[in-house]
A protein has these predicted regions:
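Soluble catalytic domains of enzymes that build or remodel membrane lipids, polysaccharides, and related
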Residues: 2-213
Length: 213
């Protein structure tokens, strides 16, 4: 029997002048209490500036997490200066997946760049590169039966791409559905799924309303 893997999924922490280190400290305690094997974050860790995270040494709180952290970028990482955001990810010990793939046992984590970058790679291109590197086998529509493919893509547009590329599970955020009125009406109109779970073919999806705003 294969050991199950416990994953904590987060999105949209928006750490900065509003959500401070003291807030994040409580979230870290909650996450550690779950005793996860892995932590995945679907973008927008940073709000609008890296400065308050540096001033409060928020990276130290990330180092208290008891499981490895993998994350993709969100649009706010671009608003806050993407090179500085990438530097913060490194200092915080976060493995950034930016149109790239990580393999952990039979689990394959694909992290897309945010669609703010109009030159980001297509999901099909990322998958093809992963196959060439041996991260994903060429069997059964791009993966073997014991592989599980997880996609992190901050903004939940074009959900059909994950299904078309054999993804097992996509995790997204961005919408903040239900957190601010009347944003929920707008997000329901903009996205095929603005919050919660969805299944398309063999692909399951979850769109998070996020931790902070």
């Amino acid at each position: 029997d294969q050991k199950s893997t416990k994953i904590v999924l987060l999105s949209d922490l928006h750490l900065g002048y509003h959500n401070r280190r003291s807030d994040f400290r409580k979230w870290v305690d909650m996450i550690n209490a779950e005793q996860p094997d892995l932590i995945l974050i679907a973008g927008d860790i940073i709000d609008n500036s890296v400065r308050p995270l540096m001033e409060e040494n928020v990276a130290a709180e990330f180092h208290r997490l008891t499981a490895p952290v993998y994350a993709c970028l969100g649009n706010h990482e671009y608003y806050s200066n993407q090179p500085k955001a990438r530097r913060f990810y490194r200092e915080a010990g976060i493995t950034l997946l930016q149109d790239s793939v990580a393999k952990i046992g039979n689990l394959c984590i694909i992290g897309r760049d945010d669609r703010t970058n109009m030159q980001r790679k297509s999901l099909a291109m990322i998958m093809e590169e992963a196959r060439k590197k041996g991260f994903i086998s060429d069997l059964h529509h791009g993966k073997s039966s014991d592989e599980f493919l997880v996609l992190l893509d901050h903004q939940p547009y074009h959900l059909e791409e994950a299904e078309q590329n054999g993804i097992d599970f996509q995790f997204s955020g961005h919408t903040h559905h239900g957190q601010v009125w009347p944003v929920s009406w707008i997000t329901d109109a903009l996205y095929e799924k603005a919050y919660g779970s969805l299944q398309k073919g063999n692909t399951r999806y979850y769109i998070s309303s996020g931790m902070g705003i």
